[in-house]
């Protein structure tokens, strides 16, 4: 199985890219959101990947974070949801948006993705609601995937121009994971904690871990 690819971006299309890894080109299918976030042609790129092998088909799907990869795997496990629909959902909402929608039972947001009807959206939310806390707690990002990428590729192709440096790990995913961990340590159940953190993150997308914890605790406090 191929779990991650690091190489140079050779070509991009409307739904896939070609990544050159030591002279071997890999076609990787991605969501619209992931495609938009990738660097330019000729630059170093790293993607987490999921490989699908069937009798008549072998495909690689690429993701910017471990959470996105896990949501793809889970979405494809739902009856009536294939890789194309999964990528449409991730492209429309992003992994954080999928986490929020499923944790909050917001099937209307899931339905906003191309090719997703109301029944399928409701089934997704119902089947995956218990999975949201675990995915939201994942902290792997593309920045972590890029660690060492420059050195590896430059050894292979020393004449190539140096790529842009990857941003340090962190951001909304790390804040969400930290907030979930804190609420779990305080004794809150996974589903309640995930719903509270998801709502807090939706109301304040730029909030850090501490602010998310405070906001989630207010939401979880008994109503008088």
Curated annotation (Swiss-Prot):
Gene3D superfamilies membership: 5' to 3' exonuclease, C-terminal subdomain, DNA helicase RuvA subunit, C-terminal domain, Nucleic acid-binding proteins
Taxonomic superkingdom: Bacteria
Keywords, ordered alphabetically: Cytoplasm, DNA damage, DNA recombination, DNA repair, DNA-binding
Region described as Domain III: 171-224
Family matches, as SUPFAM superfamilies: DNA helicase RuvA subunit, C-terminal domain, Nucleic acid-binding proteins, RuvA domain 2-like
Stated name of the protein: Holliday junction branch migration complex subunit RuvA
Assembly mode: Homotetramer. Forms an RuvA(8)-RuvB(12)-Holliday junction (HJ) complex. HJ DNA is sandwiched between 2 RuvA tetramers; dsDNA enters through RuvA and exits via RuvB. An RuvB hexamer assembles on each DNA strand where it exits the tetramer. Each RuvB hexamer is contacted by two RuvA subunits (via domain III) on 2 adjacent RuvB subunits; this complex drives branch migration. In the full resolvosome a probable DNA-RuvA(4)-RuvB(12)-RuvC(2) complex forms which resolves the HJ.
Region named Domain I: 1-64
Record function comment: The RuvA-RuvB-RuvC complex processes Holliday junction (HJ) DNA during genetic recombination and DNA repair, while the RuvA-RuvB complex plays an important role in the rescue of blocked DNA replication forks via replication fork reversal (RFR). RuvA specifically binds to HJ cruciform DNA, conferring on it an open structure. The RuvB hexamer acts as an ATP-dependent pump, pulling dsDNA into and through the RuvAB complex. HJ branch migration allows RuvC to scan DNA until it finds its consensus sequence, where it cleaves and resolves the cruciform DNA.
GO molecular function: ATP binding; four-way junction DNA binding; four-way junction helicase activity
GO cellular component: cytoplasm; Holliday junction helicase complex; Holliday junction resolvase complex
GO biological process: DNA recombination; DNA repair
Record's comment describing the protein's domains: Has three domains with a flexible linker between the domains II and III and assumes an 'L' shape. Domain III is highly mobile and contacts RuvB.
A Pfam family this chain is assigned to: RuvA_C
Keyword field contains Calcium: no
Keyword DNA damage in record: yes
Residue segments, region Flexible linker: 144-170
């Amino acid at each position: 199985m191929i779990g991650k690819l690091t190489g140079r971006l050779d070509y991009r299309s409307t739904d896939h890219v070609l990544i050159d890894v030591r002279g071997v080109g890999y076609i990787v299918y991605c969501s619209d959101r992931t495609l938009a976030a990738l660097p330019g042609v000729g630059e170093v790129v790293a993607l987490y990947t999921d490989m699908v092998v069937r009798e008549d088909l072998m495909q690689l799907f690429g993701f910017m974070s471990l959470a996105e990869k896990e949501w793809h795997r889970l979405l494809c496990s739902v009856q009536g949801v294939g890789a194309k629909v999964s990528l449409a959902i991730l492209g429309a909402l992003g992994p954080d948006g999928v986490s929020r929608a499923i944790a909050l039972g917001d099937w209307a947001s899931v339905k906003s993705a191309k090719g997703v009807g109301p029944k399928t959206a409701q089934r997704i939310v119902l089947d995956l609601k218990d999975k949201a806390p675990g995915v939201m707690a994942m902290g792997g990002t593309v920045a972590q995937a890029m660690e060492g990428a420059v050195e590896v590729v430059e050894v292979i192709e020393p004449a190539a121009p140096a790529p842009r440096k990857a941003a340090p790990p962190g951001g909304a995913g790390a804040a969400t994971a930290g907030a979930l961990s804190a609420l779990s340590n305080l004794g809150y159940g996974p589903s309640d904690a995930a719903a509270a953190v998801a709502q807090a993150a939706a109301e304040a997308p730029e909030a850090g871990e501490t602010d998310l914890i405070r906001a989630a605790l207010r939401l979880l406090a008994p109503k008088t």
